[in-house]
């Protein structure tokens, strides 16, 4: 039992910012990789948005372009920890659209992404971030 308590104590001393950095990198990588795939396979992307995804309201080419642009830009903000809380919001929206209209059976994966984003929205990016440096420099909160 003593070993378990020692392990727990060691883990409790690890900075939460390490986990926050890993969360930003992991969820950002999922979206960035999807954006790169859309960019490098643009004709296939358009075909998927037209024939398979069928996102309502938006024309397929506009929806594809918007998805690609968000998937390539918002993860960079997450990687840098810049505007992190704001960057999570459009990603939540993308997850909601994907879950509702595109891949409703992939709810476990979407819930995992959403949980990570929710943590970042609630707790911020941590000390290993530009948000933290800016807050320190200009006297804002962490």
What are these regions (language model features)?
Residues 44-52:
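Short Gly/aromatic-enriched secondary-structure transition segments
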Residues 1-43, 57-69, 73, 79-142:
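Extended, low-polarity transmembrane helix blocks
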């Amino acid at each position: 039992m003593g070993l378990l308590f020692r392990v727990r104590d060691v883990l409790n001393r690890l900075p939460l910012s390490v986990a926050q950095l890993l969360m930003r990198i992991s969820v950002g990588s999922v979206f960035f990789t999807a954006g790169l795939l859309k960019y490098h396979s643009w004709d296939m992307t358009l075909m998927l948005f037209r024939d398979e995804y069928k996102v309502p309201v938006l024309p397929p080419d506009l929806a594809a372009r918007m998805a690609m642009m968000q998937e390539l830009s918002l993860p960079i903000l997450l990687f840098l920890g810049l505007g992190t809380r704001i960057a999570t919001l459009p990603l939540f929206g993308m997850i909601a659209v994907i879950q509702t209209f595109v891949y409703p059976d992939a709810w476990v994966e979407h819930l995992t992404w959403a949980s990570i984003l929710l943590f970042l929205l609630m707790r911020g990016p941590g000390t290993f971030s530009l948000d933290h440096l800016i807050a320190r420099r200009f006297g804002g909160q962490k």
